[in-house]
From Swiss-Prot:
It comes from Haemophilus ducreyi (strain 35000HP / ATCC 700724). This is dCTP deaminase. It catalyses: dCTP + H2O + H(+) = dUTP + NH4(+). Catalyzes the deamination of dCTP to dUTP. Belongs to the dCTP deaminase family. GO terms for biological process: dUMP biosynthetic process; dUTP biosynthetic process; nucleobase-containing small molecule interconversion.
Amino acid sequence: MRLCDTDIEHYLDQDLINISPRPTNDKISGATVDVRLGNSFRVFREHATPYIDLSGPREQVSAQLEKIMSDEIILAEGEAFFLHPGELALATTLESVKLPDNIVGWLDGRSSLARLGLMVHVTAHRIDPGWHGKIVLEFFNAGKLPLALRPNMAIGALSFEVLSGAAAKPYNAREDAKYKNQQSAISSRINEDK
C-alpha cells in the first residue's frame, strides 16, 4: 500500500521515516514528498578509456572506473551545474533519507523537468528498505539545450510503500551494501559485485 500525504506526515512525525532536513508540509502532497538537489556532483571524463568491460576482472573494471570518473564537484550556493545534451552526470539529493525495514521508497523525476529533456534517474529509482543516506541521482540530458541545475532546486518526489512484512535483508544490514550511508555523489561500484 502506497502512503498518502497524511500517512507520510504521520510517519515523519513518529520518526518511522526520517528525512533530513525535514520537508515542510507544503512539500508533501497526494502521495509524494518533494526532494531538492544537493551540491555534490560527478561527471564522466570523455574518452579516458575506449570502453568499460562490465564483466571483466575486478582490477580491470576498477582501473577503468578510476579513469572515467571525475573527482567530486561541490557547488557553492547559487552556483550552477551545466548538463549538456547527451551527457550523464551524478548528483545527490539535499535530503538524507532513512527508511525502516518494512518500507520501500520510490524516486520519480518532475514532469516539468522531463518535458525539457532531464532524466533524474536513469534506471535506479527504488530506495531499499533499511536505506540510510542521500539519494544519488543519475542525470541525463535528452534535450537539445544545456540545462543549468542549482543546489536547492526541486528535483524529484519520493513515495513510500509498506511491505507485507519487515525485510529479512534490509539494506543497512547487508554486508554487500555498496552505497551504505552515502552522503555524496559516489560513482559506480560495479567492480564490488560478487
